[in-house]
């Protein structure tokens, strides 16, 4: 549990910085929501509602056959909104300001992909570069090493330690089978999902 919290600290703290911090706000979504690397890199603004504090996971960015491709995420759970704790809303608002600045500086060279997390010219971020940036962030924070993929387990462990129902953890991490998350139980209302993420957000603020 302590290891999980320590791993979350660098992304949360850096997400609140107002300087030209690139990719670090994406790490907050990876760490807090357990988003997969391809999912956070494929996140689009049209599927983000900051006022309602929720988002949908609609695409993934992956490298296939030597080129970057965007693929649709089609599962039953991907069609449901994922509620955002305040720390994620803050990170996304800061990211929007950063991207607006990038767009203005790029001028006619800006490529409008609709993606939330992009390069300075609007193009998709190379997944391998995302991994390298994440590794540097963790090393600089002097916390136990954790990979981008490993953050999903960290997030799941944190939610379990907060006594969040396994079915809710399944909703948040969008696993297709409850066995992947933990055990079975009964159906849980969507309000429980939002409450679980609020608990996680409160934990990060303490």
Predicted regions and their residues:
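Short, basic (Lys/Arg/His-rich) helix/loop patches that form interaction surfaces
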Residues: 11-24, 33, 82, 98-108, ...
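Structural detector for helix-capping/boundary residues
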Residues: 38, 43-46, 128, 154, ...
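Hydrophobic aliphatic residues
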Residues: 13, 59-61, 138, 173, ...
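Short functional hotspots where side chains directly engage DNA or cofactors
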Residues: 52-58, 147, 158, 170-173, ...
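Generic alpha-helical secondary structure signal
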Residues: 4, 8, 56, 129-136, ...
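Basic, Lys/Arg- and aromatic-enriched nucleic-acid-binding interface segment
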Residues: 1-43, 50-51, 63, 75-79, ...
């Amino acid at each position: 549990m302590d290891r999980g919290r320590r791993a979350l600290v660098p992304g949360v703290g850096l997400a609140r910085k107002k300087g030209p911090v690139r990719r670090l706000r994406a790490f907050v979504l990876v760490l807090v929501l357990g988003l997969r690397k391809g999912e956070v890199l494929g996140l689009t603004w049209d599927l983000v509602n900051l006022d309602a504090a929720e988002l949908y996971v609609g695409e993934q960015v992956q490298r296939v056959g030597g080129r970057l491709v965007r693929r649709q995420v089609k599962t039953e759970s991907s069609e449901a909104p994922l509620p955002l704790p305040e720390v994620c809303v803050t990170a996304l608002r800061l990211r929007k300001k950063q991207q607006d600045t990038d767009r203005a500086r790029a001028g006619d060279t800006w490529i409008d992909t609709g993606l939330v997390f992009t390069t300075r010219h609007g193009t998709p971020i190379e997944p391998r570069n995302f991994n390298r940036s994440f590794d540097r962030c963790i090393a600089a924070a002097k916390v136990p090493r954790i990979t981008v993929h490993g953050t999903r387990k960290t997030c799941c462990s944190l939610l379990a330690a907060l006594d969040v129902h396994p079915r809710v953890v399944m909703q948040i991490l969008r696993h297709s089978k409850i066995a992947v998350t933990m055990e079975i139980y009964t159906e849980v209302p969507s309000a429980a999902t939002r409450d679980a993420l609020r608990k996680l957000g409160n934990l990060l603020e303490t």
